[in-house]
Amino acid sequence: MRLITRWIPLANALASTMPVQVVASIENPSLLPTPPMGFNNWARFMCDLNETLFVETTDAMASNGLLEAGYNRINLDDCWMNYDRAENGSLEWNVTKFPRGLPWLGQYVKSKGFNFGIYEDSGNLTCGGYPGSEGYEEIDAEIFAAWGIDYLKLDGCNVYPKEGRTLQEEYKYLYGNWHEILSKMQQPLIFSESAPAYFSMTDNLTDWHTVMDWVPEYGELARHSVDILVYSGEGSAWDSIMTNYKFNTLVARYQRPGYYNDPDFLIADHPGLSLDEKRSQFALWASFSAPLIISAHIPDLSSEDLEYLTNQALIAVDQDPLAQQATLASRDGSLDVLTRNLADGSRLVTILNHGSESIETDISLDILGLSTDCTYKAQDLWGGSTQTIKDAIRIKLNTHATAVYKIDTDEKCSQVIPTGLIFNTASGKCLTGTSSSVGSESCNGSKSQIWQIDASGVIRTLSEQSKCLTADGKAISLQECSENNGQKWSYAITGNLKNADTGYCLTNGGGVSACGFETNSQVFGLPAGVHVAL
């Protein structure tokens, strides 16, 4: 059986005859107001995909509670197609793998209440060596529309710069072209971009930062770094999760409703993971408001796996309409503490034990941006129990386990000040302020590394709250707060922290210097809630 080889008319698949304005995805958050949830075959099955797998997965998700919990997307990955295009240039599915065809499969998936997604590549070949979309973008968009596809994952293998363009510029051209085509469709596809991943593993991260700057303008989500470990892969699955987790902490400033940072799939049945580690991946991804795309053998998921994957309290966090990504409030050799706001006015705190031993400790409320003069209700989002807290939350965690609490505030104690680490994303070093010096040090969890940033851009440490981060020439120090321009800072989407008086940017190691373009030493992560200038 051959594919549909007669293209549908361009006016039917793309925009109508009326002009359509091409807008950035972040300007149209209604296309994907919350991060996607669903299934993708890649990390579990790679190229071993077929119709039976997707039918059985669809049936299982419809009956085991995953669809009801919100996992409503069924997405194919690489290797679904033939090695050659049809004579008219259109893609053809592999009839051995999909004997009834992708239009039939799409109809089946949708009859069960799911959306249907597909994979292509922006280069001349996919990562598996199948036909890429370069030069065929409009043809492929038309055929995807004809098949009922509503989600496109566009990979970035086999991209080579044309004359006059750098590699980064070539990716921008290809993904920008796809954005224009998809934006003109009567029913635009959700656009998942993989471009940043191809720039994430270099020492000089300027191109990676640059790609991250433009992907929110073109699509609804972007894979920012390396692939998560596949089921048959060698190495530590936990280390792989931690690698992608750490990359995600570097890019929080980009996320907003309509665009989501994607740290890759939930590997829920990987044999190398303990239950605590699986639960941690889910809790961290939910705290990030990251895509929750499961790559596992769904029919064989255990009751324990299904229990955490369908945790409604954590799914509600993931799907919170603010879409604010949790950021680091504190980090040391064992614990990461992350915080964010939720749309109902509550505060989320997520505590990860990434160390090798169990730990029991108190998490002080002031590092969460909350007042220690107030009393709060804290709900454990794993078990559902609620406790009254005043100064701190007492936590006890196994190695590689994660706790998540939702802290309710009342009118008297509703003020939350963005609080947490200011860290250089290239070195991982934390800005550290004492009365004698301000510089960059390894993150150690001390309050001299935990900063509060108010709405006017004034920055102070928790350890010395009467003193503010001050620029004088190219030097920085803590000085008594006076709210002069030397103590006011602005944070840009590029990651630059710029002083209002000098016009210089904070630079790793201490001090300020002339602002460069996406230079490693001047890109910083700041707490969620700080205003980001676009």
From Swiss-Prot:
Tagged with keyword Transmembrane helix: no
E.C. code: 3.2.1.22
Compartments where located: Secreted
Catalyzed reactions per annotation: Hydrolysis of terminal, non-reducing alpha-D-galactose residues in alpha-D-galactosides, including galactose oligosaccharides, galactomannans and galactolipids
Top EC category: hydrolase
Domain Ricin B-type lectin, chain residue ranges per copy: 413-534
One Gene Ontology term of the molecular function aspect: carbohydrate binding
Signal sequence bounds: 1-25
PROSITE patterns documented for this protein: RICIN_B_LECTIN
Keywords: Disulfide bond, Glycoprotein, Glycosidase, Hydrolase, Lectin, Secreted, Signal
Gene3D superfamilies recorded: 2.80.10.50, Aldolase class I, Golgi alpha-mannosidase II
Residues carrying sugar: 50, 88, 94, 124, 204, 444
Known role: Hydrolyzes a variety of simple alpha-D-galactoside as well as more complex molecules such as oligosaccharides and polysaccharides.
Protein name listed in UniProt: Probable alpha-galactosidase A
Organism: Aspergillus oryzae (strain ATCC 42149 / RIB 40) (Yellow koji mold)
Gene: aglA
